[in-house]
Amino acid sequence: MDISFYTGAGGGVWSLEECARWAKAHDFDAIRLSAGGVADPETVLREGPDEINDTLKAHGLYLAGLAAHNNLLDDDPEKRDAAASRLHKAIEAASRLGTPAVITHAGSPVGFRFYGGYSAPPGNPSDRSTELVGRFKERFTPIVKLAEEKGVKIALDVAVRMGNIACNPQMWERVLDAVPSDSLGLSCDPSHWLWMMILPPEDAIRAFAGKWYYADVKDCEVSREMLFRQGIIGNWWWQYRVPGRGQLNWGTIIGALLESGYDYVLCVENEDHGLPGLAGIDLGGRHLRQFLPKKGEPYDRPPGFWKVE
């Protein structure tokens, strides 16, 4: 496994050259770019991949993936068509860039309330999960076919609060079954599972062995005192942290990923209010590195996946 981080470059943030120079100086192997700025898909398709690839290669880095979050499940047909067009271009741009992964999300028109009212049984009048899985199949089938043709894998983000039906094991099964393809999988980010109580995270990883196509890694901290004071409807009883500043066991998580067949990047994502910016990304990368085999040393993976049945 390599270590990467998520950032934008160009378009008002730091330049790709500045980004690459910092990444190399802080022992990163790769970066993941958002589909904007220097990595805007229309720019890449019009001008080609050389500016990005040559700049990264000059610093001994590579592009780990392209982030293109677009809500293809919006209730407004025009908005979901526009989102599909943007994702289509991002997949074509990723193929031109030679990066194997596009990270997106399944989307949702109702935020995280797609199951309907709390404590209401499945199929209640406000439960839209079945409808939205059907919409996912309709909207993502041509997108996944394009990814197959272009040799790109789509990794679905597992975050929930952005509005995303693919946010828990039940819905991962449903969307992956709806569009079965080796080009559609998941992006591992166990920070969400801690506060959602999808625990232990290593069992969630092993249950979907072979379907982790990317690993967006954050940590999380739950305050039991604030949970007592606010209950789950509060807004401050959990916080995202960079790896090493939260409550997740990264040695165990990385072991589960390796045992589940994942051998690509660990991509640091910084939403840590207590250590924002590059300082947090640097700490996260250093914390993760200690759990990996030394560079150049192969990992002797056991035969077959260790999968929860």
Name these PLM-found stretches.
Residues 6-10, 34-36, 68-71, 107-109, ...:
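Active-site beta-loop-alpha junctions enriched in small/polar residues
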Residues 16-36, 97-101:
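Catalytic domains of carbohydrate-active enzymes, especially glycoside hydrolases
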Residues 17, 50, 54-62, 74-185, ...:
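Active-site acidic/histidine proton-transfer and metal-coordination neighborhood
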Residues 23, 31, 56, 83, ...:
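Conserved, mostly hydrophobic/aromatic
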Residues 277-298:
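C-terminal helical cap(s) of enzyme catalytic domains, especially alpha/beta-barrels
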